[in-house]
Amino acid sequence: MQLDKERAGVLVGSGMGGLTVFSDGVQALIEKGHRKITPFFIPYAITNMGSALLGIDLGFMGPNYSISTACATSNYCFYAAANHIRRGEADLMIAGGTEAAIIPIGLGGFVACRALSQRNDDPKTASRPWDKERDGFVMGEGAGVLVRLRSPFVFLRSLFNELFRFVREEKKRGNEFSI
């Protein structure tokens, strides 16, 4: 069975988007002027680029957007992807989230709003979100996706072949030809 790419979508969100690209762009503006900002500044700083680039690379033409709801972003993406399948708008959805905010401006912002745990002397007990004695969260970075299918076995072979091709090709090049 062949995967119908018009019925395959991507929903990958990010709480903050391309924070490193944004930070680098602001630094270039301040130090060298607007002519030294990369032309990829806006496209790579916006939160929908995870979905957009994955959709472009896989050739998926179904629903493709991103959701940004802070720490709950991935959960909202999973729910929305399931609804696209439930409503018959897609047969396959890749859904999840990504975040990479551990850079000076990201850490500085969370320090400024006093959101980070102060338990630096005991890292094993620093992250305690449901404890009455909690004092903030511990930052992390990562990405993860789930593949939701209307019929779990119909598309698996085609999908995994496509995903493995994507991973192999990404090792060879960047995204220089997508924009």
Where are the regions that the model predicts?
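Intrinsically disordered, glycine-rich low-complexity segments
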Residues: 167-175
